[in-house]
């Protein structure tokens, strides 16, 4: 199994841990440049995550919690740390692994083998939900039909719904994911660059729950740096899968990630600074918004998704209240038809164009991602 490179500069072996002053330091923390030995790093890393959980009151005794497990470093470390904290602090949680098989040959099949080993290593139950069983489409088939540029748009929507359906199948009302501080900062940047103010306001929420849904989602790694997660996995010799998804290079998130790396080289605290900014962002009252934005809103059609005879889809953008049920599948949505059903309907009709707002046609599957990124569902 390929091992991910540990992205830290070597420090002098003569340097002592700045906490215990007794053991040699082996790493320098990216968030505060503190030099630590392995033992002190483990303790600090785990304690900070416990404090995040306690401060946000994420869990209650007796909760059954599903860990979104991909086999990657984030979810593997999350499973390991939650097992440790559950025993150390007596959370009294029932932890299970919930994995999604998107159907990406040469990637997901290998990573699921890692998840199955984690199941035995952490003595947790495992449930695997596949796109093919749930939607009758694998990601490889979707990419073949809609193009690689659309892959992350489809996968993000379908994966989120698959996790919820998997949790419901297991009778679980809380799903935790391995989204870390870097992911949170990237999301803020992505929404800022897109001008997506609605999502920008919610980019840094640690606990989310749709109106009418019993399933909560939380991110215990919200303040944990990706570099430290990699170091923890490396020093603990955890079993994880480190190959990137074959479709990921086409994702817009990669652009935000490169921008974040450049910013971090200039200002090491930028990740936490961006998260702090995201936490305190709030939309201005409607009366203060620009006239241009108001005029744009007036030209938008009702949010009724219509599948046309030629395979195109007319997508409106009038807001519906959170908590509606999709008329097709019954899944919670803020619209009449959920986003997953809209995407799947287009695939079933092998569409090559999408009608947006005033029925203007957008030709070519390669433009689908750009179109969907501009819509608020």
Curated annotation (Swiss-Prot):
Q: Which domain of life is it from?
A: Eukaryota
Q: Where in the cell is it found?
A: Cytoplasm
Which processes are annotated in GO (biological process)?
protein urmylation; tRNA thio-modification; tRNA wobble position uridine thiolation; tRNA wobble uridine modification
Record's signal peptide: none
Q: What family does the database annotate? A: Belongs to the TtcA family. CTU1/NCS6/ATPBD3 subfamily.
Looking at the keywords, is Chaperone present? no
Q: What does this protein do?
A: Plays a central role in 2-thiolation of mcm(5)S(2)U at tRNA wobble positions of tRNA(Lys), tRNA(Glu) and tRNA(Gln). Directly binds tRNAs and probably acts by catalyzing adenylation of tRNAs, an intermediate required for 2-thiolation. It is unclear whether it acts as a sulfurtransferase that transfers sulfur from thiocarboxylated URM1 onto the uridine of tRNAs at wobble position. Prior mcm(5) tRNA modification by the elongator complex is required for 2-thiolation. May also be involved in protein urmylation.
Give the classification, highest ranks. Answer: Eukaryota, Fungi, Dikarya, Ascomycota, Saccharomycotina
This protein's GO cellular component annotations are: cytosol; cytosolic tRNA wobble base thiouridylase complex; mitochondrion
Instruction: Tell me one Pfam family matched here.
Output: ATP_bind_3
The protein's predominant localisation is: cytoplasm
* Identification of the protein by name: Cytoplasmic tRNA 2-thiolation protein 1
Query: Which pathway does this polypeptide act in?
Result: tRNA modification; 5-methoxycarbonylmethyl-2-thiouridine-tRNA biosynthesis
Example GO molecular function: tRNA-uridine 2-sulfurtransferase activity
Record's keyword terms, sorted = Cytoplasm, RNA-binding, Transferase, tRNA processing, tRNA-binding
Q: Which CDD domains match?
A: CTU1-like (cd01713)
Task: Give the EC number.
Answer: 2.7.7.-
């Amino acid at each position: 199994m390929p091992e991910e490179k540990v992205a830290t500069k070597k420090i002098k072996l003569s340097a002592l841990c700045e906490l215990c002053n007794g053991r040699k330091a082996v790493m320098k923390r990216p968030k505060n440049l503190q030099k630590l030995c392995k033992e002190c790093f483990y303790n600090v890393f785990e304690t900070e995550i416990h404090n995040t959980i306690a401060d946000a009151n994420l869990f209650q005794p007796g909760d059954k919690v599903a860990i979104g497990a991909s086999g990657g470093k984030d979810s593997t470390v999350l499973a390991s740390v939650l097992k440790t904290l559950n025993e150390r602090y007596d959370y009294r949680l029932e932890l299970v692994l919930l994995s999604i098989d998107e159907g990406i040959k040469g990637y997901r099949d290998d990573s699921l083998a890692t998840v199955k080993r984690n199941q035995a290593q952490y003595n947790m139950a495992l449930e695997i939900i596949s796109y093919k069983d749930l939607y009758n489409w694998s990601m490889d088939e979707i990419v073949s039909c809609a193009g690689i540029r659309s892959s992350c748009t489809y996968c993000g929507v379908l994966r989120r719904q698959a996790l919820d359906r998997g949790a419901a199948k297991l009778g679980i009302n809380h799903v935790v994911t391995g989204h870390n501080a870097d992911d949170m900062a990237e999301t803020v940047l992505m929404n800022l660059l897109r001008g997506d103010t609605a999502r920008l306001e919610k980019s840094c929420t640690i606990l989310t729950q749709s109106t009418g849904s019993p399933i909560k989602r939380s991110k215990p790694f919200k303040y944990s740096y990706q570099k430290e997660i990699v170091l923890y996995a490396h020093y603990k010799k955890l079993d994880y899968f480190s190959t990137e998804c074959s479709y990921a290079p086409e994702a817009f998130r990669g652009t935000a990630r490169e921008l974040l790396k450049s910013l971090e080289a200039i200002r090491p605290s930028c990740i936490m600074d961006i998260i702090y900014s995201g936490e305190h962002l709030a939309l201005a009252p409607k009366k203060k918004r620009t006239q241009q934005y108001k005029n744009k809103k007036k030209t938008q059609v009702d949010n009724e998704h219509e599948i046309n005879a030629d395979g195109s889809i007319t997508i409106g953008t009038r807001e519906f209240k959170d908590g509606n049920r999709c008329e097709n599948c019954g899944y919670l949505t803020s619209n009449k038809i959920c986003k997953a059903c809209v995407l799947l309907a287009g695939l079933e009709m092998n569409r090559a164009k999408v009608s947006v707002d005033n029925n203007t046609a957008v030709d070519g599957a390669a433009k689908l991602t750009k179109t969907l990124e501009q819509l608020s569902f």
